[in-house]
C-alpha cells in the first residue's frame, strides 16, 4: 500500500531534507521512524516532493512510501509522530494508488518567505524570519514582482551550481502581505530551481532599498546570468507551504 503524508518540520536543527552521512536530516529521521514501526532490518525508502536546504522550514511538505502494514489512515500520524522527534510532525496520511509520486505527480508548489521588520532583533524569531529593519518601498517591490509572474528562463534567479539544463519555470502567483510586525512573500509556481525563491526574495528586497529599479527585473531575466540578479535571502525565512496535486 502506498501512503501519502503531509508533514511539517522546523528546519533550524536539520542539515536539510536529504540523507547525508553523519548529519541530522529530515529524511533520515523519517526513514528511521518507519524502520522502527515496521520492525524492519532495512530502511523504508521515503520519497518527498523535493529537497529543502539546511534551515528551511516546511508547513506542508509531501512524502510517500510503500508499506505492507494495515494501519487505518487516521492512525498513521499518531503511529509516526510517536517515533519522530518533536521538530517533525505528520499532519495527515492517506492511502493512494501506486501511480502517485510525491515529486512527479506535483502540479504546483507554494512557498512563503517571512520577514521581521522590528527595529531590533527578536531572539524568538531569529531562526524563523529574516530581520530587515531598514525602510522598504513596497510599491516598487510589488511592481517589480509583476515582472516575475509568468513563464520565463530563471537562470539569473538560481544558484550557479544548479545542475538542471532547462531553467524555464512558470510563476503563477507572487504577492506580498503585511503581517503586522513584518512582511510575507507568497509565491506559487509549477516548480522551482535551486535557491530560486530565496534569490527572488533577496532581489525584490534590493528593489525595496533602491539598489535596483522595478524595470531592472526584466533585464535580469533576459540576462540569464546569476550575477545580474540580487542577493540570496537567508534560508531561515523560507517555508515550503504546500504542494498541490490533481484530485
UniProtKB/Swiss-Prot annotation:
Signal peptide: none annotated. SUPFAM superfamilies: Pseudouridine synthase. The keyword Isomerase applies. InterPro entries: PsdUridine_synth_cat_dom_sf, PsdUridine_synth_TruA, PsdUridine_synth_TruA_a/b_dom, PsdUridine_synth_TruA_C, TruA/RsuA/RluB/E/F_N. Formation of pseudouridine at positions 38, 39 and 40 in the anticodon stem and loop of transfer RNAs. Homodimer. HAMAP family: TruA. This is tRNA pseudouridine synthase A. It comes from Bacillus licheniformis (strain ATCC 14580 / DSM 13 / JCM 2505 / CCUG 7422 / NBRC 12200 / NCIMB 9375 / NCTC 10341 / NRRL NRS-1264 / Gibson 46).
Amino acid at each position: 500500500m502506498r501512503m501519502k503524508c503531509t508533514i511539517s518540520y522546523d528546519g533550524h536543527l536539520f542539515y536539510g531534507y536529504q540523507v547525508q552521512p553523519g548529519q541530522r536530516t529530515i529524511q533520515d529521521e523519517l526513514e528511521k521512524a518507519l524502520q522502527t514501526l515496521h520492525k524492519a532490518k532495512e530502511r523504508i525508502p521515503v520519497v518527498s516532493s523535493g529537497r529543502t536546504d539546511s534551515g528551511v522550514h516546511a508547513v506542508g511538505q509531501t512524502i510517500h512510501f510503500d508499506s505492507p502494514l494495515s494501519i487505518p489512515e487516521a492512525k498513521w500520524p499518531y503511529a509516526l509522530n510517536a517515533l519522530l522527534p518533536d521538530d517533525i510532525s505528520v499532519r495527515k496520511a492517506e492511502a493512494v494508488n501506486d501511480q502517485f509520486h510525491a515529486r512527479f505527480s506535483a502540479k504546483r508548489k507554494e512557498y512563503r518567505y517571512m520577514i521581521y521588520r522590528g527595529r531590533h532583533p527578536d531572539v524568538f524569531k531569529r531562526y524563523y524570519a529574516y530581520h530587515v529593519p531598514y525602510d522598504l518601498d513596497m510599491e516598487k517591490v510589488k511592481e517589480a514582482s509583476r515582472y516575475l509572474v509568468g513563464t520565463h528562463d530563471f537562470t539569473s534567479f538560481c544558484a550557479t551550481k544548479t545542475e538542471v539544463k532547462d531553467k524555464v519555470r512558470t510563476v503563477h502567483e507572487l504577492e506580498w502581505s503585511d503581517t503586522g510586525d513584518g512582511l510575507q512573500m507568497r509565491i506559487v509556481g509549477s516548480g522551482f530551481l535551486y535557491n530560486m525563491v530565496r534569490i527572488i526574495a533577496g532581489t525584490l528586497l534590493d528593489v525595496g532599498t533602491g539598489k535596483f529599479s522595478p524595470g531592472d527585473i526584466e533585464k535580469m531575466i533576459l540576462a540569464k546570468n546569476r550575477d545580474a540578479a540580487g542577493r540570496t535571502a537567508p534560508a531561515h525565512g523560507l517555508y515550503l507551504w504546500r504542494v498541490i496535486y490533481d484530485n
